[in-house]
């Protein structure tokens, strides 16, 4: 078997020298390999290049598909191995840099706080303890809110009872006479309209009254007043009733009213008038 005579660079006069061997050996020189790499790069890389396309692009006589197939396969394997090595080296570098960064952070944390190492050792218990602490705090706040609500409710109930007792005492202290269900309704209406009767409406209704305020008992510090109204005759014939000392008559059913005569230390005296008859 005869070998290919490469001459100086593996090819002579633009082509590879031929032999009678169907599978002649070829020494891939640096120049020949560079031309192969240029052809593969022009075709889009080793994955896209084919032996036939490389053969046409190189255009060397004596270069067969057998030579290009084997060389292209070796070239692809070499590129894959190079990529793998680059990936492994890059991963090692990334791992080393991350380890160094973590080491620096951990050392800085320990230098700032000596208890960091204990927390790192008990890292499994830290989240559970933190959650328990938050839960206990939430329960305490909830209990405090319940206590505040209970106190407010008790105060509201006490105020309601106090108002009810005041209304009952006021109702008992007022003489209602032969009061029935209608009198009770009038009493409730009177409680609602009491402030209005004491206000400007009372002044308009009693526009004909003459008020005379004078000081009685000059040496005494307490002031007494007397209101005298115009007297009119009672047309209905109702008897004049003088209420007991210390009470004011507020019966809404009576046709005649009462004027306040004297309010001293020992009681209240009133006299009837017919303002109610005029208003009715």
Swiss-Prot record:
A motif (LHEQLE) lies at residues 142-147. GO terms for biological process: regulation of DNA-templated transcription; regulation of phenylpropanoid metabolic process. Residues 129-149 are annotated as: Coiled coil. Residues 20-80 form the HTH myb-type domain. GO terms for cellular component: nucleus. Residues 77-98 are annotated as: Disordered. PROSITE patterns: HTH_MYB (PS51294). Its main location: nucleus. This is Myb family transcription factor PHL11. It comes from Arabidopsis thaliana. The lineage of its organism: Eukaryota, Viridiplantae, Streptophyta, Embryophyta, Tracheophyta.
């Amino acid at each position: 078997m005869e070998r290919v005579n490469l001459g100086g660079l593996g090819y002579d006069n633009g082509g590879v020298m031929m032999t009678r061997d169907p599978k002649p050996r070829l020494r891939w020189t640096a120049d020949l390999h560079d031309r192969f790499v240029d052809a593969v790069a022009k075709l889009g890389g080793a994955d896209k290049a084919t032996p036939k396309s490389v053969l046409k692009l190189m255009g060397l006589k004596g270069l067969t598909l057998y030579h290009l197939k084997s060389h292209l396969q070796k070239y692809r394997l070499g590129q894959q191995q190079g990529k793998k090595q680059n990936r492994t080296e890059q991963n090692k570098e990334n791992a080393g840099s991350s380890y160094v960064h973590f080491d620096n952070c951990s050392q800085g944390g320990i230098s700032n706080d000596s208890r960091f190492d204990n927390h790192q050792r008990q890292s499994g218990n830290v989240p559970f303890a933190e959650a328990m602490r938050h839960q206990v705090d939430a329960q305490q706040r909830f209990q405090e809110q319940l206590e505040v609500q209970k106190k407010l409710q008790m105060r509201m109930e006490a105020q309601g009872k106090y108002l009810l007792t005041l209304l009952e005492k006021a109702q008992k202290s007022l003489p209602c006479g032969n009061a029935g269900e209608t009198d009770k309704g009038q009493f409730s209406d009177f409680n609602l309209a009491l402030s209005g009767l004491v206000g400007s409406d009372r002044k308009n209704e009693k526009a004909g009254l003459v008020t005379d305020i004078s000081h009685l008992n000059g040496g005494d510090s307490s002031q007494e007043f007397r209101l005298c109204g115009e007297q009119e005759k009672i047309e209905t014939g109702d008897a004049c009733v003088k209420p007991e000392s210390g009470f004011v008559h507020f019966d809404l059913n009576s046709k005649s009213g009462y004027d306040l005569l004297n309010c001293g230390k020992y009681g209240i005296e009133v006299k009837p008038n017919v303002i109610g008859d005029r208003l009715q």
